[in-house]
From Swiss-Prot:
InterPro entries assigned to the protein according to its UniProt record, in alphabetical order: LysR-type_TF, LysR_subst-bd, NodD_PBP2, Tscrpt_reg_HTH_LysR, WH-like_DNA-bd_sf, WH_DNA-bd_sf
Alphabetized GO MF terms: DNA binding; DNA-binding transcription factor activity
A Pfam family recorded for this sequence: HTH_1
SUPFAM superfamilies reported in the protein's UniProt record: Periplasmic binding protein-like II, Winged helix' DNA-binding domain
PANTHER family the UniProt entry points to: HTH-TYPE TRANSCRIPTIONAL REGULATOR LEUO, HTH-TYPE TRANSCRIPTIONAL REGULATOR LEUO-RELATED
Domain called HTH lysR-type: residue spans: 6-63
Family the UniProt entry places it in: Belongs to the LysR transcriptional regulatory family.
Protein name, UniProt field: Nodulation protein D 1
């Protein structure tokens, strides 16, 4: 199909090339042979009167013209896919849908593991790609490159729909042999002790406990930074360091790496965890189905926590 002389199929090829930045990967993404993709590049260059891509090693470097085209091409294809082409109703037992989800290692272990096990029973052909926390999740959501973002609500962008999953509480923990934890922690002592903290992404963004502590005007002495919450418990054992961790994570490790929970000198640090999805996926039957599974599993977790607290 052509529109003003442009074969619209070429936009699909152009988007794949701009996303993958590699000829072979782009061809594989849209099920073209490498010669066919090379031919598509030649036709694109002829239409736009620009090289569009310059090869450096194995990577395709976008020209300024291609960089300018990228957002418009992606948005056009997304709107066609999500607004013009009718959504197929999902049949879980037959679906081979792949869901891409950005979340922390903590949420993978505590929450997503339950969802994945349930999906394996109810929709065995559905697959997942779990991605580490990104420096710019808003852009990935806008482009529809990911299906879900699971984060503390306060760290989420506000321009996409979202919904609460469950509440979490942060607790102060350390090695049971740490003699500094024998008495109640004063704020002065808490701030003077060495801390282990998780930071995420290339920019090493602070995690939720850092945001909440900064909100109260406190800066800890962070002696060790790691790229995930699940790395922290073993690094506290045999040391005088402490950490502020989600209670569910501490409970998860209590059989293998028991940690001492001490009363936090700050007021209770509660926060809601939420799931967010691209606005363009709001009416996608597959996305709705997965959301409902997540909400159901989150409700079960909340109910289980309330029961164990009684």
């Amino acid at each position: 199909m052509r529109f003003r002389g442009l074969d619209l199929n070429l936009l699909v090829a152009l988007d794949a090339l701009m996303t993958e930045r590699q000829l072979t990967a782009a061809a594989r993404r849209i099920n073209l042979s490498q010669p066919a993709m090379s031919a598509a590049i030649a036709r694109l260059r002829n239409y736009f009167h620009d090289d569009l891509f310059v090869m450096q090693g194995r990577e395709l470097i976008l020209t300024p013209r291609a960089e300018a085209l990228a957002p418009a091409v992606r948005d056009t294809l997304l709107h066609i896919q999500l607004s013009v082409i009718a959504w197929d109703p999902i049949k879980p037992a037959e679906s081979d849908r792949r869901f891409r989800i950005i979340l922390s290692d903590f949420m993978t272990l505590i929450f997503m593991e339950k969802v994945i096990k349930r999906i394996a029973r109810e929709a065995p052909r559905v697959t997942f790609e779990l991605l580490p926390l990104d420096d710019d999740p808003d852009e990935l959501l806008r482009r529809g490159d990911v299906d879900f973002l699971i984060l503390p609500d306060l760290l989420m962008p506000n321009i996409h729909p979202k919904a609460k999953l469950f509440d979490e509480t942060l607790v102060c923990v350390g090695c049971p042999m740490n003699k500094q934890l024998e008495d109640r922690l004063s704020m002065e002592k808490f701030m003077s002790m060495g801390h282990v903290a998780a930071k995420f992404g290339r920019l090493m963004k602070p995690s939720v406990e850092q945001w909440l502590l900064l909100e109260h005007g406190f800066r800890r002495r962070i002696e060790l930074v790691v790229p995930g919450f699940t790395l922290i418990p073993p690094l506290l054992v045999g040391t005088d360091r402490i950490a502020t961790l989600p209670m569910r994570l501490v409970k998860h490790f209590e059989q293998t790496i028991p940690l001492k929970i001490v009363e936090h000198p700050l007021p209770p640090l509660h926060f809601p965890l939420a799931v967010q999805w691209p606005a363009l996926h709001n009416t996608d039957p597959g996305n709705i189905w997965m959301r409902e599974i997540m909400f159901d599993e989150a409700s079960r977790m909340e109910a289980s926590s309330e029961t164990s607290a009684v």
